[in-house]
Curated annotation (Swiss-Prot):
Coiled-coil region list: none
Function: Nucleotidase that shows phosphatase activity on nucleoside 5'-monophosphates.
Principal subcellular localization: cytoplasm
EC number: 3.1.3.5
Keywords: Cytoplasm, Hydrolase, Metal-binding, Nucleotide-binding
Catalytic activity: a ribonucleoside 5'-phosphate + H2O = a ribonucleoside + phosphate
Pfam (any one): SurE
Cellular localisation: Cytoplasm
Family: Belongs to the SurE nucleotidase family.
Protein name listed in UniProt: 5'-nucleotidase SurE
Amino acid sequence: MIILITNDDGFGSEGIKLLKEIARNFAPEIWIVAPDTDRSGAARSLDYPVKQSIGIKQHSEREFSVSGTPADCVIIALNKVMNKKPDLILSGVNIGSNVGDDICYSGTIGAVMEGAARSIPSIALSQVYHDKIDWHNTKVFAPKVIAKLVKVGWPKNIVMSVNFPATEKVKGVEFAEQGEYNIDGDLTFTENSNGSFSLNWSREHSGSGSINKIKEGFITITPVKLDFTDYDTLNTMKNSCADEFSSIAD
């Protein structure tokens, strides 16, 4: 097996070093291609269409840092750096959860979406924390979760988002929806001495899903689709709105 590892926290992050150790349980050939700086919140954005150039720095035979986004890293890995297509892409281990609307913002998720778009099984891994990051639950349980996911498989247009709780005891694994945040949470601005502002966004969870399960001490696995289309609404509109829009091009 050949595994490609990337992340959004940057090439030097603790999480990617941990993920390299975890990947050694599965593959003799491991490649790392990750952003040269923290690109958290990059989602699936790309730098290469707008930049004049993107830097690629080789650190060892199979380890590279890139002056681009996590999605850039996957594209560069598959088209420039690697000589073979990987069997699996792992992204993370992210510092903090990827649940609720975070999935839309996450570079960790964006990277695996880039892999899934190329029909490569791809898993994003995230470690929840409160005051201080503790990697214990990821170290213990990630190898088991990855092995099980690889064994059972999943459709090629889906990525797997795995979140490890910060609780002392892990109760088990739950397959759960991403959940929701109250997007209108408290957003505070603190002016700095240089005239810039520090932002703090406090959001409350509303509803069920991964967020609640993680708080309860469960590892959560959420299948995330590349296709954003809401087919129920699409079919409803085709049936109920066609006449309303039929005269627009007349």
